[in-house]
Amino acid sequence: MKDLKDRTVLLTGAPGGIGPHLASRLHAEGVSLVLSGRNQAELERLATTLPPARFIVADLSSEEEVEQLATAAGPIDILIANAALPASGELVTFSVEEIDRALNVNLRSAIVLADLLLPGMLSRGTGHIVLMSSIQGKMPTALVSVYNATKFGLRGFGLALGLELRNSGVGVSVINPTFVRDAGMWAETGVAPHPLAGQVTPDQVAAAVVRAIKENRPEIDVAPLGTRLAATMPRLVGSMARRIGATAFPPAAVARQVAKR
């Protein structure tokens, strides 16, 4: 999809984290935005800065509201499944409800939206699905086992769906950012990541999304070179990390994310 002008884009998780950066970059490409999130006031504020964007309030932890969102959005050319929860902490500290909520928001909603919007894309012979995963969808880390599960699942779904849709005119891209500074769930903790992980900016992530769509890239890791190389050999890196004691998500960050589960 070389030209995004006048394409209709559904962006979930629009008002928070890197959402506004994604929306702004896409708006600059001339797309028509459909913004979704839980906070109506924040959605309305964002939409007014990106005319003629419209917004739909939806809680993606609700199975019913996910389906309602797909219907209300209307024909969509590009789906960007960006909504996510931190889901940090030891597994034994999670309630069943918290696990379900993380799975619904981070994984199930993206799969269901793709399922419901894909027939229209196929009938038009064009479209794109972008799944915002994480470098933690390739490299497991202690204290984020539930989050890892959702991102590993999202990445696997996206890569497999891309194979299913080969030569259909509809592309699928998985975006794997490392820790994002200045915006998003990591930046909100105020904790510095391990130097091996590195950091990127929201604008770098937004640029990767646009590039993935235009070039029909199956997967892009948005991370410093060393982190990208490490992600290609997770078993070796995991062994090295255990030796130097760098296997766990920073406990201080976990403590600040628990309330958002």
Predicted regions and their residues:
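Conserved glycine-rich cofactor-binding loop
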Residues: 15-16
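Conserved glycine-rich Rossmann-like NAD(P)H-binding loop of the short-chain dehydrogenase/reductase
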Residues: 31-45
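The beta1-alpha1 cofactor-binding region of Rossmann-like NAD(H)/NADP(H)-dependent oxidoreductases
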Residues: 57-68, 96
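Substrate-binding pocket helix/loop in short-chain dehydrogenase/reductase
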Residues: 90-91, 98-103
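Active-site helix of classical SDR
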Residues: 114, 150
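Residue(s) in the substrate-gating loop at a strand-loop-helix junction
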Residues: 134
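C-terminal helical subdomain
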Residues: 174, 194-231
